[in-house]
């Protein structure tokens, strides 16, 4: 019997997948526990359309991320911070401040978790900051830190 899984079932498949199982297993275990429903042509067609829509959505997100990455690669931001005579900042610049400056100066809203800094910036100078926008899409942004 063909069934469509409503949840992930260990050893059988993931949610929304169509699998072939024994009739008794489907009727006595999967269907009563609402883990699966019998597969019909309409349901299979609906699942196929849903997967195609998800694929198109992922492709759009990937294109948007690539477009944003190319814009960020060409851009740079300048952050002014209080610093001592030897170029050491009072405090530090974290990925949160970089995300805020990107929004303020460039107009792009980027989640601070996507900005990769090994350590907060503590000295005046120029830095290449890595931003992971999407799976496999990485941008490097020039960040110039100056004394205010």
UniProtKB/Swiss-Prot annotation:
Ribosomal protein found in the keyword field: yes
GO BP, sorted A to Z: translation
Superkingdom of origin: Bacteria
Keywords associated with the record: Ribonucleoprotein, Ribosomal protein, RNA-binding, rRNA-binding
Record protein name field: Large ribosomal subunit protein bL9
Keyword ATP-binding included in the entry's annotation: no
Pfam families xrefs: Ribosomal_L9_C (PF03948), Ribosomal_L9_N (PF01281)
Family indicated by similarity: Belongs to the bacterial ribosomal protein bL9 family.
An example Gene Ontology CC term for this record: ribosome
Protein's job: Binds to the 23S rRNA.
GO molecular function: rRNA binding; structural constituent of ribosome
């Amino acid at each position: 019997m063909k069934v469509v899984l409503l949840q992930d079932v260990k050893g059988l498949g993931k949610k929304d997948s169509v699998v072939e199982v024994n009739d008794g297993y489907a009727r006595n275990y999967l269907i009563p526990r609402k883990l699966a429903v019998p597969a019909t042509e309409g349901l299979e067609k609906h699942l196929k359309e849903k997967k195609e829509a998800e694929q198109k959505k992922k492709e759009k997100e990937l294109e948007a991320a690539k477009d944003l990455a190319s814009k960020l690669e060409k851009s740079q931001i300048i952050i002014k911070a209080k610093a001592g005579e030897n170029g050491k900042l009072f405090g530090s610049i974290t990925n949160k401040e970089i995300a805020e400056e990107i929004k303020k100066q460039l107009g792009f809203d980027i989640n601070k978790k996507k900005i990769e800094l090994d350590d907060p910036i503590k000295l005046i100078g120029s830095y290449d900051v890595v931003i992971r926008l999407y799976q496999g899409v990485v941008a490097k942004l020039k960040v110039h830190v100056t004394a205010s």
